[in-house]
Amino acid sequence: MTAAPTWWVYLLRCGDGTLYCGIALDVEARLEQHRAGKGAKYTRGRGPLELVYREACHSRPEALRRERAIKRMRRSAKAALL
C-alpha cells in the first residue's frame, strides 16, 4: 500500500511585501507556476516571489482547512509563523 501524497500549505512573500497563502502537492512546481504568471491572479505582477513558509498536511481537506485558518490570521500572526 502506498502512502497518500503529502499536501503542503505555503506562504509566498510578494515583491510588494504582501503575503500569499496557497496549497499544493509540489510547492516548488507551484512556485514556478506563480513566477511564470500561471498561478493565482493575486501573484501576477507582484514579483519577485519568495517562498517563506511551508507546512505539511496529510490530506487535501486538512490543507484547505489550514489554508483558510492562515488566511484569516492577522498579518502579525502570519509573521509569527515565519
What are these regions, as identified by a protein language model?
Residues 1-71, 75-82:
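GIY-YIG nuclease catalytic motif and its immediate N-terminal context
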